[in-house]
Amino acid sequence: MFRTMMNGKIHRATVTEANLNYVGSITIDSAILEAVDMLPNEKVQIVNNNNGARIETYIIPGEPGSGVICLNGAAARHVQVGDVVIIMSYGMFTTEEANKHEPKIVVLDEKNHIEMILPEEKTHTTL
């Protein structure tokens, strides 16, 4: 049996752009992608802290160090520039792998620079 587990998480990213006329996807600063082990074209879930929307799309890498978080195409309808979002990727693991799995989690500051890397998520954690 395989279990779907969170593999990477970008916490408190600030939306810098919303481009309705692009074909689709989310553009993410490639330096952030590297820190959380996310790849171009990987499926991600995006949760908007401002309006509660949850959407799925795929990643396009952005300029490293730019801080870009841009929702493209139809996904742009679910955000406004300045919204705070959580971006998560998932992987499928056997139960044995899942018990040993350690997701990569980064917390961003208001300019989308990595503020901290968390070794794990604890219950009742507030940032």
From Swiss-Prot:
Pathway: Cofactor biosynthesis; (R)-pantothenate biosynthesis; beta-alanine from L-aspartate: step 1/1. Is synthesized initially as an inactive proenzyme, which is activated by self-cleavage at a specific serine bond to produce a beta-subunit with a hydroxyl group at its C-terminus and an alpha-subunit with a pyruvoyl group at its N-terminus. Keywords: Autocatalytic cleavage, Cytoplasm, Decarboxylase, Lyase, Pantothenate biosynthesis, Pyruvate, Schiff base, Zymogen. The active site is at 25 (schiff-base intermediate with substrate), 58 (proton donor). GO terms for cellular component: cytosol. Its cofactor is pyruvate. GO terms for biological process: alanine biosynthetic process; pantothenate biosynthetic process. Its EC number is 4.1.1.11. Binds 1 pyruvoyl group covalently per subunit. The modification Pyruvic acid (Ser) is found at residue 25. It is found in: Cytoplasm. GO terms for molecular function: aspartate 1-decarboxylase activity. Catalyzes the pyruvoyl-dependent decarboxylation of aspartate to produce beta-alanine. Belongs to the PanD family. Heterooctamer of four alpha and four beta subunits. This is Aspartate 1-decarboxylase. The lineage of its organism: Bacteria, Bacillati, Bacillota, Bacilli, Bacillales. The gene is panD.
